[in-house]
A protein has these predicted regions:
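Short, intrinsically disordered N-terminal pre-domain segments
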Residues: 1-22, 103-105
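Surface-exposed ligand/attachment interfaces on beta-rich extracellular proteins
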Residues: 21-42
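Short, charged recognition helix plus adjacent turn
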Residues: 28-31, 67-73
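Residue-level marker for the onset of beta-strands and adjacent loop->beta junctions
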Residues: 34, 45, 75-77
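Noncatalytic modules at the cell exterior or secretory-pathway interfaces
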Residues: 44-47, 81-97
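Short, surface-exposed beta-strand/strand-loop-strand elements in extracellular ectodomains
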Residues: 50-68, 101-102
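Beta-sandwich interaction modules
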Residues: 70-85
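Short, Lys/Arg-rich amphipathic alpha-helical interaction segments
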Residues: 88, 100-105
Length: 105
């Protein structure tokens, strides 16, 4: 359900701002035992972040998330992140977590 909401939010932005978003890139993190930061391409305005195999925690306030602290992305769901793409950190809750990230401008 969250995946659909993220897509609806992006579509809503399309109509609100009168333009489409350009896909700018994709990356996958398969090791999340320690917090990771994103590597957005130049011009990226937001990212769709999907948790795979495990719930994922994130923070963007300068403090690294842990397996028990931070905002949660439920496994197999995604969120739209419109904050500072270079600042957000993500970590798995349990071993085997991965994330898929799509960037848009």
């Amino acid at each position: 359900m969250v995946a659909d909401k993220s897509l609806m939010n992006a579509q809503s932005d399309y109509y609100r701002y009168g333009h489409s978003f350009t896909p700018l890139g994709y990356e996958q993190f398969t090791t999340l035992g320690a917090p990771v930061t994103l590597n957005p391409p130049e011009g990226a305005r937001f990212a769709l972040i999907q948790a795979v195999n495990s719930n994922v925690r994130w923070r963007d306030d300068g403090t690294s998330p842990t397996a028990t602290t931070g905002m949660r992305i439920i496994v197999d769901e995604q969120m739209t992140y419109r904050g500072h793409l270079h600042v957000i950190e993500l970590v798995e809750e349990t071993t085997g977590g991965e994330i898929n990230v799509a960037y848009y401008g």
